[in-house]
Swiss-Prot record:
Protein name: Probable CAAX prenyl protease 1
InterPro entries: CAXX_Prtase_1, Peptidase_M48, Peptidase_M48_N
Catalytic activity: Hydrolyzes the peptide bond -P2-(S-farnesyl or geranylgeranyl)C-P1'-P2'-P3'-COOH where P1' and P2' are amino acids with aliphatic side chains and P3' is any C-terminal residue
Membrane disposition: Multi-pass membrane protein
Amino acid sequence: MSPGLCFLKEISVIQATPKPTTRSFANCCKMGILQHLMHILDIPGFPWKIVIAGFSIGKYAWDLYLRRRQVPYLLREKPPAILAEHVDEKKYQKALSYARDKSWFSTIVSTFTLAVDLLIIKYDGLSYLWNITKFPWMDKLAASSSRFSLSTSITHSCVFMFGLTLFSRLIQIPFNLYSTFVIEEKYGFNKSTLKIFVIDLLKELSLGGLLMSVVVGVFVKILTKFGDNFIMYAWGAYIVFGLILQTIAPSLIMPLFYKFTPLENGSLRTQIEELAASINFPLKKLYVIDASRRSTHSNAFFYGLPWNKGIVLFDTLVKNHTEPELIAILGHELGHWYMSHNLINTIIDYGMSLFHLFLFAAFIRNNSLYTSFNFITEKPVIVGLLLFSDALGPLSSILTFASNKVSRLCEYQADAFAKQLGYAKDLGDGLIRIHDDNLSPLEFDSLYTSYYHSHPILVDRLNAIDYTTLKKNN
């Protein structure tokens, strides 16, 4: 039956019902659209391999194009006029050299990654990995009883995903080592050791494997149990898992990598507590973490449930900034909370995840997609999700512009909030110092910024808070 006839049949059933509900009509529309999408996308013999390989090559070419546009900005001799008196020219040239090194290294890594991806596509790497991770006992157990069939499917999917993740991490190790112990070391950022590097890698693989097993297991179970009606159940699971992860990450996961120490009593702690109290921020915990064990880069963030918040400061941030600068930076961070930016971003994320699940529903039964990648007899849902993600590449790239635009708007608003609190000059000083300490470039191509940057560039942020005027007046 064609999608159109199926849709008409569903309409006739609803019309025959004495009291049709809004929900049933919505479901009808949803299923009609899904059936239509399934029909359009599932074309026998459609060259999905060529299409997805083309998307990968296109993404690679796009990244190269943007990096090429940025090159002239990395060859400039002097900093922007607004920063001329704040930035040492030797430090400025060092920052540009650091950016150039990272840019060419990123090109090498992305070239290697593209080559691996194309080889996996050409030689049916996913199908091969699926077959070798299917141990004989799985088939025997599934055949012995129907109640074991779902369990073996979940186990197989988890083993497959762990194998894929392990492969991806292992082939990236040489690049990670070079980035950490050559590039970061060259510019004075690296404080890590080979021992710390290996321990962190093992922790990441172990923790990642555990979390991934939970996510994959729940996802496969939902799709197996609810079939084509999985969307809302999977979306609900995504929301619940995200909330749990946000809650436990600072207290259970991050302490595996960093030592959390309560900020000692003193002037800084008192000022932070007074700032939090002035805007009714429910501050319960205030920590400093030993980020300097791995790097000299700095950061700060807040976390927690709406009624129980904590603030985390990198020790590098505390060490390198004056107290007024630290308070101004935290004024910016708390501005995100005050204006509900996290909530807004969460709602956007949940909305996009629902949209992606709706699109995925049109791919999940796509025979031509699975067949193109040599999945003839089996159509694992976890593989379908991976292939769907690859097919969604161009849309994801387009959405990156929108998400970064929203993020930059939030950053401007948080800066304005700190300015309203009277911290504009100190915030400007702090931002300049952060960029100086992190050897961040000061000028960027506009298209490059639109695609890659979730934060406005420094010059634009300083202009937005009238930093130059405030500096002259002081």
